[in-house]
Design a protein with these regions (language model features):
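Glycine-rich loops and low-complexity Gly/Arg-rich segments
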Residues: 42-44, 55-59, 80-84, 108
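Short intrinsically disordered coil segments
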Residues: 45-51, 72-73
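Oligomerization/assembly interface segments of phage tail-like spikes and tubes
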Residues: 48-62, 96-107
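Acidic-leaning, charged glycine-interspersed low-complexity segments
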Residues: 69-108
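Generic hydrophobic secondary-structure signal
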Residues: 5, 9, 31-32, 56-59, ...
Length: 108
């Protein structure tokens, strides 16, 4: 399920990075950054269950409702109701709006 989320976010066409950016894209852009952690339940020496929790961060110059809608559409399709808009911030250092959604997924 996590890989499906990654692929769906990449398919939006919004520049994408998993974990962190090595360089920031130039120009007027929307950027999606995905971070996650994994929790497992083990039994009989094997992983029995896995769950992912993470955040999807969208950075933009100005408000672009189409990019916000794309991210929400992907999260709804991949996570069902297991996500929430955690914060909207203005990043003074970069001049970007920063939207952060927190999600949970069952693992494969």
């Amino acid at each position: 399920m996590y890989e499906a989320l990654v692929n769906a976010l990449k398919a939006t066409g919004i520049p994408f990075a998993e974990f962190q950016w090595s360089t920031r894209p130039a120009g007027d852009f929307g950027v999606v950054q995905l971070e996650r952690s994994v929790a497992t339940v083990e039994g009989d020496g094997e992983i029995q269950e896995r769950a992912y929790e993470g955040s999807v961060d969208l950075y933009m110059q100005g408000r672009d409702n189409s990019k916000i809608a794309l991210v929400k559409q992907v999260l709804t399709a991949q996570c069902g109701g297991a996500y929430v808009l955690s914060s909207i911030q203005f990043e003074e250092e970069t001049g970007l709006l920063h939207y952060e959604w927190v999600f949970q997924l069952e693992g494969e």
